[in-house]
């Protein structure tokens, strides 16, 4: 029975690898703005919302670019 699971894992592994790459690319493409939007919606106080709107998205964009550079090679 163990060999069946190993064989199934070998067949499924390339699909998971492709799906993981697609998820990573989508997250890097739309992630910073989406995460910043979620953070802004979850904060109730208006001054803090404005501060997050100005500061959070550029920081997340820089982090996403650094992550993309690491996996670009």
Curated annotation (Swiss-Prot):
It is found in: Cytoplasm; Cell inner membrane. Induction: By heat, ethanol, osmotic shock and infection by filamentous bacteriophages. One of its GO terms (cellular component) is plasma membrane. Coiled coil: none annotated. It is a peripheral membrane protein. Pfam families: Phageshock_PspD. The keyword Transferase does not apply. Transmembrane segments: none annotated. GO terms for biological process: phage shock. Belongs to the PspD family. The phage shock protein (psp) operon (pspABCDE) may play a significant role in the competition for survival under nutrient- or energy-limited conditions. This is Phage shock protein D. It comes from Escherichia coli (strain K12).
């Amino acid at each position: 029975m163990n060999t069946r699971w190993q064989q199934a894992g070998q067949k499924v592994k390339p699909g998971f690898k492709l799906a993981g790459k697609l998820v990573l690319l989508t997250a890097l493409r739309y992630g910073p703005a989406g995460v910043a939007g979620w953070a802004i919606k979850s904060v109730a106080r208006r001054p803090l919302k404005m501060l997050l709107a100005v500061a959070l998205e550029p920081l997340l964009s820089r982090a996403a670019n650094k992550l993309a550079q690491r996996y670009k090679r």
